[in-house]
Amino acid sequence: MTGDYKEYKGYALITGGAGFIGSNFLDYAVDKYPDFHFTCIDKLSYVSNYTTVFLSKVLNQPNFRFLEMDLATNYKFLYQFMVEDSEINKITHIINFAAESSVDRSFIDPLYFTKNNILSTQNLLECVRILLGKKEELRNRLNFVHVSTDEVYGEQDENASVDEKSKLNPTSPYAASKAAVDLIIQSYRYSYKISVTVIRANNVYGPRQYEEKLIPMTLGKLKKFINQKSQKIMQDKITLHGDGLHKRKYLHIYDFINAIDLVWMKQGSEVYHSTLESKMSGQIFNIGSDDEIDNLSLVKFICDYFLYRKLSLKNLDYSKYITFVQDRNYNDSRYSLNYEKIKSLGWRPQIPLETGLRKLIDEYY
């Protein structure tokens, strides 16, 4: 795997870039940074419809290319790309989005989540470790941003929040796999002096999110309902776990992308202008929001706005649209991040939840 592109200021490897967050980031970054070259590696799973459809905006850009690869199982090809062909591919930045993220699926097949989420990132770290062993001059000039999750902290009591120094207390197989990866990253930083920054965000929502997540699931079922021949009965109701009162904080995808951009550019600027280890190396940043809402209230808001916009319906009988199902094996009561640290770099969320939801419905549904 070689490249024939011109010389660029930097060469970014974006893993998991064909999915929800990764593809939105690439739309933003490929356009904003024409002096950077972006290589996207993705295995093309169900969340991207097994295609590069979410990459249609960037596929033909001169500073972009796509490689289909499963990081967890194709170590040989990853090694060839990153190590053997390093003189050509010249990776200077890595942003790792690659992971399976469905909590519900992780309860069904926890072993798969362990294998996939841990090996995909550790294979990436191994290639970086070997590359830096061969090219010591890259040690303080290659920066790595890993996208983790707030779920590694477990649940928080009412009115409590966790900061970046809080202990990890995952409660689902998915969260445990992500926490394990965070610790493996920490070990590689200490043992092999790899410059890595970790990002942990609240629930991210926006266009292209797969319908297994609450917001797109709700919107998908409402869209199906209005396309029925008759709107008397909703044939496929919106499902809520337990009593629907579990709380989450929501962050719009565009706000999250701005936070990622801030972190990777700050880390990159530091390593480019110093032979010393970046101050960002080893740092963890919570990317949070103050928009907290329980699942039932969230779904009711979406139903109200969507059905009024599409069918002019008011004063809904929510029982016609919502059904309650057995709760998860374990369902965290709430997540809440203290994000003062990223605020100190100048970032704050700009899109309120209600505004973001209305815009999502108006433009995509």
From Swiss-Prot:
GO terms for molecular function: dTDP-glucose 4,6-dehydratase activity; oxidoreductase activity. It is found in: Cytoplasm; Nucleus. InterPro entries: NAD(P)-bd_dom, NAD(P)-bd_dom_sf, Sc_DH/Rdtase_CS. Signal peptide: none annotated. One of its GO terms (cellular component) is nucleus. Its main location: cytoplasm. One of its GO terms (biological process) is nucleotide-sugar metabolic process. Keywords: Cytoplasm, Nucleus. Belongs to the NAD(P)-dependent epimerase/dehydratase family. This is Uncharacterized protein PB2B2.11. It comes from Schizosaccharomyces pombe (strain 972 / ATCC 24843) (Fission yeast).
